[in-house]
Amino acid sequence: MKFYSSHPMPESLAAAIAVPLLGLLPAAQAASTAVQLPSVTVEGEYSSYQPESAQSPKFTAPLADTPRTVQVIPERLIQDQGASDLEAVLRNAPGISMTAGEGGRPASDLPFIRGQNSASSLFVDGLRDPSTQSRDTFNLEQVDVVKGPDSVFSGRGGAGGSINLVTKTPRNQDFTEVQAGIGTAETYRGTIDGNWVLGENTALRLNLLGTRDTVPGRDKAVEFSRVGIAPSLRLGLSGPTRVTLGLYHYRHRRVPDYSIPYDPRTGTPITETIGVSRRNFYGLVRRDSGDTEDYAATVKWEHDLANGFKVENLARYSRATVEQITTMPELKTADLAKGLVYRNLRASYQVNDSFANRTDLRGTFDTGQWRHTFDLGGEFATSRRSRDRYKQEIPDAASPCSPVTDGNNPALCASLRDPDPHVDFPGTVRRNHNPARYHTDILSLYGFDTIAFDEQWQLNLGLRWDHYKTSGRNLPVRGAKPPVYERAARTDNLFNYQLGLVYKPRPDGSVYASYGTASTPSAVSDYAPADSISGTSQQLKPERSEAIEIGTKWQVLDRRLLVTGAMFRETRKNTSIEVAEGLRAPAGKSRVTGMELGVAGSLTPRWDVYGGYALLDSKLVRASHKSGAQGQPLPSAPRHAFSIWSTYKLLPELTVGAGAFYRSKVYGNADAGYNKDGTPKARWVPAYWRFDAMAAYQLNKHLTAQLNVYNLLDKTYYAKTYRSHYAALGPGRSAMLTFKLSY
């Protein structure tokens, strides 16, 4: 998109004032109009590090005029960083932490946004994605992150915000890009992105993926492979009616890794306390396995109506299967004294079938002197989920790490300092074939309107109603014959809204205040994307969240650079806590107060930058009657988080870049109490810095070589925390050389 400015700025001057601009000084911007200079028009392109808008039609204003924190992570940034999965992409979004899963889900994307669990708030092209997977980037065009309660956009859940993955679709031009990469740690990756125009109004796009990796800094037994294919066909490229058909298949096979156990004496990982090697892998190669497979079919229909109105309908069916048998390293104080780690089995088999359909009508109209930009829509979604357990049978397996056996069963009891993941596994692991089953239906209606009263004042409104109905039967009671199932059901009507006021002192700047809400039904799971319900949770009313945010956004340096800042307070109420022995009630409460700063775009035509900082002052205001968590920080809510990435074009053919990422101390749980043996209940990981770098050289018109180096200082850090048993190590230092062939 082209832009026009009457205030050009020399390249040297822009670089000199870059740092003060990051301080968000709109007053200085206003003062610059005191002297009248001859008007000169400068024409250029927005930086590809500064996306203009989010993908969803529910956003009825550009990002610079949207009265809340919305961060868009663009495709070029993902490519420059060599980010191959969603976890790496979200490293660019301060305020988001990934947590480790349980119940056989260590390899899935489980984000926390501003200290609130957002595992159920992941979307693909605006439709909720209930699958349990570690997502690859081979078919991503951008990632949109909404921060703060956003049920008005995303529906049920959304207490901390939501994440929308925007996929690649056909374009009106021919191109093919083939990438082949080889890296340290036996890493191989290949992708193909091709687009072909077929006739006047049809285009085909095809994205392919193949990768095989081990994990840098971990035992070579920890390996995985991914394959993916995503074809899409668009009919009516330039006509008033457009239809896009898309398919998606993705498979992720791996040896699962629960990483490093906590030291029960301190609550920190044993790599920090007794100096065990970060390469230690406590799993069993001959028992453990993980296999995730996802299918999706999408149909999008768009039609241009009169007066600039547009209508679109998006429908998608998806099926996700997860089979995971893994080791959770369990370390107790008595085992620690003997130098033993219990190889505790964690396994599950899950199948999730879902269908969603969304229809939107959007456009612009005037009422007197007021300009309305609106979106009206409705959505229906249904999902069915099953979850089964496994049973392990091993001769003489009782108390494998007790003094009775003295750790003589190495299949279940590993050496703390020198575990052998290749020992024989003498037993069997079989699925029970008595799954829990859940069924959820949601009907939604919503409306959004941005009202421009004049060139300076805008009002942003949003309203949503969700009819939420869920039912299910839980896993059978252990040992009961015949099987005894607990059945439960609940129906809720959820109303959510947002209100935002925007003042634009200049066309390239805005100041805003906003209020928004979210509703989280009791069946929304903390550690899974899909819903589940129990006899206890069916009695509980939905949690409520609300947020107040004030902020400012400025497009500076001839609109090449977007600089943002915001302060907020978010409150979550009605969380389920134990108020008396055996009695739960929606009486819990938590609060997060904080601020965010962001920068995205170009300092000069050669110098791009993307970064941000988040301060989260979180507190569990009201907790369980016997918990030591009250008054403590929330889990997965680091007080400080910072990221910065920058590239510079040294020569027309050569681009170099580097990035820094910081996260302060993070808790896996919020409990400040002590166990009966005097050991702390709290689990936490220390702060860390991580540094990455890249260089790309265009060898000729069609071929480019790019080198990425990750974790330059080979820092031992922890990318994910879990509330009780373990923390997941981040990868060690590695490098990847990728050749890109484009034509």
UniProtKB/Swiss-Prot annotation:
<protein>
    <recommendedName>
        <fullName>Probable TonB-dependent receptor BfrD</fullName>
    </recommendedName>
</protein>
<dbReference type="GO" id="GO:0009279">
    <property type="term" value="C:cell outer membrane"/>
</dbReference>
<dbReference type="InterPro" id="IPR010105">
    <property type="entry name" value="TonB_sidphr_rcpt"/>
</dbReference>
<keyword id="KW-0798">TonB box</keyword>
<comment type="function">
    <text>Probably involved in iron transport.</text>
</comment>
<keyword id="KW-1134">Transmembrane beta strand</keyword>
<dbReference type="InterPro" id="IPR039426">
    <property type="entry name" value="TonB-dep_rcpt-like"/>
</dbReference>
<dbReference type="InterPro" id="IPR037066">
    <property type="entry name" value="Plug_dom_sf"/>
</dbReference>
<dbReference type="InterPro" id="IPR036942">
    <property type="entry name" value="TonB_rcpt_b-brl_sf"/>
</dbReference>
<keyword id="KW-0732">Signal</keyword>
<keyword id="KW-0813">Transport</keyword>
<keyword id="KW-0410">Iron transport</keyword>
<dbReference type="Pfam" id="PF00593">
    <property type="entry name" value="TonB_dep_Rec_b-barrel"/>
</dbReference>
<dbReference type="GO" id="GO:0038023">
    <property type="term" value="F:signaling receptor activity"/>
</dbReference>
<keyword id="KW-0406">Ion transport</keyword>
<keyword id="KW-0843">Virulence</keyword>
<comment type="similarity">
    <text>Belongs to the TonB-dependent receptor family.</text>
</comment>
<dbReference type="GO" id="GO:0015344">
    <property type="term" value="F:siderophore uptake transmembrane transporter activity"/>
</dbReference>
<feature type="signal peptide">
    <location>
        <begin position="1"/>
        <end position="30"/>
    </location>
</feature>
<dbReference type="InterPro" id="IPR012910">
    <property type="entry name" value="Plug_dom"/>
</dbReference>
<keyword id="KW-0408">Iron</keyword>
<keyword id="KW-0998">Cell outer membrane</keyword>
<feature type="domain" description="TBDR plug">
    <location>
        <begin position="62"/>
        <end position="168"/>
    </location>
</feature>
<keyword id="KW-0812">Transmembrane</keyword>
<feature type="domain" description="TBDR beta-barrel">
    <location>
        <begin position="173"/>
        <end position="743"/>
    </location>
</feature>
<keyword id="KW-0472">Membrane</keyword>
<feature type="short sequence motif" description="TonB C-terminal box">
    <location>
        <begin position="726"/>
        <end position="743"/>
    </location>
</feature>
<dbReference type="InterPro" id="IPR000531">
    <property type="entry name" value="TonB-dep_rcpt_b-brl"/>
</dbReference>
<keyword id="KW-0675">Receptor</keyword>
<dbReference type="Pfam" id="PF07715">
    <property type="entry name" value="Plug"/>
</dbReference>
